[in-house]
Every structure is written in C-alpha cells, then in structure tokens.
Amino acid sequence: MIQQETYLTVADNSGAKRLQCIRVLGSNRRYAHVGDVIVAAVKDAVPNMGVKKSDVVKAVVVRTKATLRRETGNSIRFDDNAAVLINEDKNPRGTRVFGPVARELRERNYTKIVSLAPEVI
C-alpha cells in the first residue's frame, strides 16, 4: 500500500531514481495498490535526463511490498515499492522498464508498460 509521503524506486529509464508520493489519484483515496496512478515528487534524479529533482510527475505503481491477493487465491509480494513515470496519455516516459511487474497492469490497460517489462508475474 502506497500512501502520502511514501518513497518509491523508479522502475524505468526516464531519469528519476526515487519518488515521494504526494497524492493518490481517485476520489478521496488513501492507499494506492498495483496499477493505481499517483502524483509524486522526484527526490533523486540522474543529471541531464528528462526529469529533474523536485519535478512533480504522475506515475503508475508496478510493485508493492504489501501482499497482493488475486482472485485465484494466490498472493504475491515484491521486495520494493516501485513505479513507472507516465505522461498524460498514460504512456511510459521511459523506453525501458526494469524488474518484474504485476499482471494486474494488463487488466488496467497499461499494455505498453507490460510489453516493455522483462517479466510479468
């Protein structure tokens, strides 16, 4: 579960390294799970890339440390909280995605992120 003030790692090559969640998008929502969109501030970035430190960006959560329960009864949990930066059209800002992503992203129409990911769990 991601909430305000939560730090996340960035799972793409957009130039940002760490994000801090500012707001979970949706009608008065407190927590974000895999596939949810958040507004975040860039806390650490690579120099001379598309994003700079203190930029406010939108990102979709791709991995959470909290257990993710599936309808089949399975549950998965990742080692870190990670997000991928997106633009207004919900397309990723980077050209590569690092690490595994959850299958729930495909159900939420983030097919571009799923196709860039090396592994879908």
From Swiss-Prot:
Q: Does the keyword Metal-binding apply?
A: no
Q: Which Gene3D superfamilies match?
A: Ribosomal protein L14
GO (cellular component) term, any one: cytosolic large ribosomal subunit
UniProtKB keywords: Ribonucleoprotein, Ribosomal protein, RNA-binding, rRNA-binding
Q: Which InterPro entries match?
A: Ribosomal_uL14, Ribosomal_uL14_bac-type, Ribosomal_uL14_sf
On subunit structure and binding partners, the annotation says: Part of the 50S ribosomal subunit. Forms a cluster with proteins L3 and L19. In the 70S ribosome, L14 and L19 interact and together make contacts with the 16S rRNA in bridges B5 and B8.
Functionally, this protein is described as follows: Binds to 23S rRNA. Forms part of two intersubunit bridges in the 70S ribosome.
Name of the molecule in the record: Large ribosomal subunit protein uL14
Q: Which gene encodes it?
A: rplN
